[in-house]
């Protein structure tokens, strides 16, 4: 019976830790950029796009494809930084694990 109670306590603690981490990720802001800062995106800890900043000199109707590539590169840069931040928050524990709702 004691083992069951210990397991329940451990599961409750893990759930509380997950809830706390979810809240931290929601307010986390990570910036990624490309083109030497010509395009910058900001993601939250859940990799949801929060903002995009495009320098006016990049906007050229004849170079739309380049702008699209810069946006994708900036997003990918920020997404990689979110992964790094998450791994750091987890302290290496389970950084390689695919935890639903966290990765």
Where are the predicted features?
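N-terminal intrinsically disordered, cationic/polar leader segments
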Residues: 33-53
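Conserved acidic
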Residues: 6, 63-70
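Short beta-strands and strand-coil junctions in structured, solvent-facing domains, enriched
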Residues: 38-40, 59-61, 79
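Residue-level signature of catalytic and energy-coupling elements of molecular machines
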Residues: 14, 47, 71
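Long amphipathic alpha-helical segments used for membrane anchoring, targeting, substrate engagement
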Residues: 1-31, 81-103
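Short, well-ordered turn and helix-capping elements at secondary-structure junctions
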Residues: 25, 29, 34-36, 56-58
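Stable alpha-helical structural segments in soluble proteins, enriched in small hydrophobic residues
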Residues: 70, 74-82
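A short interface-forming secondary-structure element
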Residues: 52-64
